[in-house]
Amino acid sequence: MSIDFSNFAYYKNEDMETNMTIRHSKTSDLPRLMEIFDVARSFMAETGNPKQWVDGYPSEEVIMEDIGNGDSYVVEKDDKVVATFVLREGDDPTYDIIYNGEWLNSEPYATIHRIATSGETKGIMHTVMQFAKQRHDNIRIDTHEDNKVMRHLIMKEDFKYCGVIRCWSGAERLAYQFSKHK
C-alpha cells in the first residue's frame, strides 16, 4: 500500500497490528508529553544511559518551540498519546561537522529528534520510521553512546552509522543516516 504524505496532518498506520496514528502535537498535549519524557528519562537511566536528557531536558520551552514550529508529532493508540518525536525538515547545524566518519550523501535531509515513548505500546520506532521514510529520502538521527536500546532500534530500521557529531551542548552523539539512494 502506497500512501502520499505530502499534505498531511494525520497518519494512520494500518499495516501495523497495533493500529497507531500520528498527528501534529498540540499545546494541549504538553502535560502528557512531559509525562512521556519523564518515563523515557527513567527508562534510559535503568538501561545504562543516565547521561542523556539530564537536568530536565527537554524542557517545556523546548517542546513548545517544537510545537510552534510544526515539527512535533504524537503517536496515538486508542486515542491515547503513547509517544512523541520531532521530525524537522532541512539542515541541522549540529550535523554540519561529523567526526570519525562521513554522511552517506550531502542531499537534503530531515532529522528525527527527541523520540520518546510511554512504554505502553510496542512498535513505536517502526511506525515513526515508516512515517518519516514515506516523506523523506534522507533521514538523519543521533543518540548517546550509552543508549544501546536506541542504537539497536536505529540500526534495525536500515540506518547506517556515519560518525560522531557534537550537539548544541557540546556533548558527543553517535550519528546515523537512512538514504533511499544508498
Language model features with spans:
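A short helix-loop-beta-strand connector motif used in the catalytic cores of GNAT acetyltransferases and
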Residues: 61-74, 91-92
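Conserved GNAT acetyl-CoA-binding A-motif
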Residues: 135-146
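Conserved active-site alpha-helix within GNAT-family acetyltransferase domains
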Residues: 126, 146-163, 171
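Conserved beta-strand in the GNAT
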Residues: 74, 80-90
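Conserved acetyl-CoA-binding loop-helix of GNAT-fold acetyltransferases
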Residues: 117-134, 152-156
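A short beta-loop-alpha structural element at the N-terminal edge
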Residues: 21-35
